[in-house]
């Protein structure tokens, strides 16, 4: 991409505590907030000469903010004919079953081949909606249910339901270790200091609550059900590591001490090398934006996790 120019400006202390994308829209008024948000996501914004790719990062005030603008037509998301596994659809919402390996929306390293690109292809009106109607995300290698808005009324309604914690999102996962019982994890989460693609539990983070219960126990593993009360980035994965029961196959959050006899067992050693986090969003429940009735959807575990359960 050809850069147009380089712009730097010092932020005022009066902007302390405000979101980065909002601050940029106030300082660089020639650009829209949505355009600036895309620049942030694409690693084209520096805060004190360090790349920041979080639009919601809070500004302290006094930092030097630098943007690398691109021609706006180069930032347009392209419609792509990507298959969507549709579980339910009406004129207001779409429920899909996302496979592992599919990214939700374009970002650094994933400029195309995402659910957003697929929505732009299959639903022409989605181009007029924020993020093509996407109101929540699943990690690339987490499979399962997502709700997507098909009009602006539904989009705003679903965002409100999420804010009020009125969308029930339940998961199944397989963790390392033999759990005794279920419980609730109430620990704040923030971005990791050094590993910028990972998150961590920290007292300065955002409030995060995860409920879990045991479905079945095995020699070295536990099959669990999880319900989110909040929806932070990597929340389940971070919380499971925090209580020392990390998800099988998690590339970012499996750094823990394994029982001495664990890797000596050939079967469990293969399980340790499962190619993605063993996590699936199996259940979704919400009040329909227009019909107002409660609707629920449940999908089975994907084949790879079903086979994993047979191995443990």
Swiss-Prot record:
Principal cellular location given in the protein's record: cytoplasm
Catalytic reaction equation(s): uridine(1911/1915/1917) in 23S rRNA = pseudouridine(1911/1915/1917) in 23S rRNA
Subcellular location: Cytoplasm
E.C. no: 5.4.99.23
Annotated Gene Ontology cellular component terms: cytoplasm
Single GO MF descriptor: RNA binding
BP GO annotations: enzyme-directed rRNA pseudouridine synthesis
InterPro entries: PsdUridine_synth_cat_dom_sf, PsdUridine_synth_RluA-like_CS, PsdUridine_synth_RluC/D, PsdUridine_synth_RsuA/RluA, RluA_PseudoU_synthase, S4_RNA-bd, S4_RNA-bd_sf
PANTHER family tied to this protein: MITOCHONDRIAL RNA PSEUDOURIDINE SYNTHASE, RIBOSOMAL LARGE SUBUNIT PSEUDOURIDINE SYNTHASE D
Protein name: Ribosomal large subunit pseudouridine synthase D
Species assigned in the record: Buchnera aphidicola subsp. Acyrthosiphon pisum (strain APS)
Higher taxonomy: Bacteria, Pseudomonadati, Pseudomonadota, Gammaproteobacteria, Enterobacterales
Protein's gene: rluD
């Amino acid at each position: 991409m050809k850069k147009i120019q380089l712009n730097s400006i010092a932020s005022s202390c009066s902007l302390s505590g405000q979101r980065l994308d909002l601050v940029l829209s106030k300082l660089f008024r020639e650009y829209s907030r949505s355009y600036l948000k895309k620049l942030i996501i694409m690693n084209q914004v520096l805060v004190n000469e360090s790349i920041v790719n979080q639009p919601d990062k809070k500004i302290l005030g006094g930092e030097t903010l630098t943007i690398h603008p691109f021609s706006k037509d180069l930032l347009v998301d392209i419609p792509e004919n990507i298959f969507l596994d549709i579980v339910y659809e009406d004129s207001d919402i779409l429920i899909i079953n996302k496979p592992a390996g599919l990214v939700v929306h374009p970002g650094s390293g994933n400029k195309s081949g995402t659910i957003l690109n697929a929505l732009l292809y299959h639903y022409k009106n989605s181009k007029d909606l924020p993020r093509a109607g996407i109101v929540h995300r699943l990690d690339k290698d987490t499979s399962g249910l997502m709700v997507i808005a098909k009009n602006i009324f539904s989009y705003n309604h679903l965002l409100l339901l999420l804010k009020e914690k009125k969308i029930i999102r339940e998961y199944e996962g397989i963790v390392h270790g033999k759990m005794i019982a279920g419980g609730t994890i109430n620990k704040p989460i923030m971005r990791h200091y050094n590993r910028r693609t990972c998150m961590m539990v920290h007292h300065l983070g955002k409030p995060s609550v995860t409920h879990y219960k045991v479905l079945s126990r095995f020699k070295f593993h536990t099959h669990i059900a999880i319900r989110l009360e909040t929806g932070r980035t990597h929340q389940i994965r971070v919380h499971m590591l925090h209580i020392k029961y990390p998800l099988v196959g998690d590339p970012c959050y499996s750094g823990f001490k394994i029982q001495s006899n664990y890797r000596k067992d050939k079967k469990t050693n293969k399980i340790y090398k499962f190619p993605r986090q063993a996590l699936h969003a199996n259940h979704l429940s919400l009040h329909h934006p227009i019909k107002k009735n409660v609707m629920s959807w449940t999908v089975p575990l994907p084949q790879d996790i079903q086979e994993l359960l047979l191995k443990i």
